[in-house]
Amino acid sequence: HGTPLVITAHSLEPFRPWKREQLGGGYNLSSWAEKDAYEHADRVIAVSAGMREDILTAYPNLDPDKVVVVHNGITMSQFETPADDDPGWKVFERYDIDQNKPTLLFVGRITRQKGLPYLLQALHFVDPGIQIVLCAGAPDTPEIMEEVKTAFAKLDEERGNIIWIEEMLPKPELNALEHGCDAFICPSIYEPLGIVNLEAMACGLPVVASATGGIPEVVVDGETGYLVPVDQLHDGTGTPTNPDKFVHDMADAINRIMDDPEK
């Protein structure tokens, strides 16, 4: 009807084939709807340069001039250090998190793209004196939840010093948690930008993150954290071509950053 169509791209179905586990036949429908919408859009906004490349790879019929990059941002005032009497700090007591231990934090949904199973493998090679806090919930499927539970139980038995928070924390508690930890980990295998890294850095945390998607546009290797190199299959899954190397490189980066988080 002559009304311009503008799309902001935060993810792409062709690069998330694991969504079929969650959506079943609905994945075919969402893939068709996305392709049709993109190819008829007057403008497509990508949240990173990496995302722009993915869009043009997934939908080669798109006019590249119609695809522009506008990075996501955050509201810095939402990530200020809580006052000493802020009730958000109670999250440490409720989950028995020792604020005197060096602590690594993960925040994310339990989904293939967030790379949690790789992190749980990597933590076997991380200094056991480092306390690990996993804020991980909202699993895509029962199958991946069981996979994570099994890996967590094995890790907990082997090294301990790990806390798993399954509930989605209210913002004041999550903000306090991020301000009270020492470093942040983002092991994603698909991440168009990675707002969690912006939020962690806004709280003063150095970040260890996979060098995939838009993450290298957010985390400056050697300055605001460490990037973990990862070669990936080009079959849409993003699976690391050498999972063992990815896992060990991640563990090495975690140990380095936790050895000197102020660096």
Features from the language model and the residues they span:
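Nucleotide-sugar donor phosphate/pyrophosphate-binding loop at the beta->alpha transition
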Residues: T3-P4, F15-D36, E53-L56
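Aromatic "clamp/platform" in nucleotide-sugar-dependent glycosyltransferases that forms part
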Residues: I189
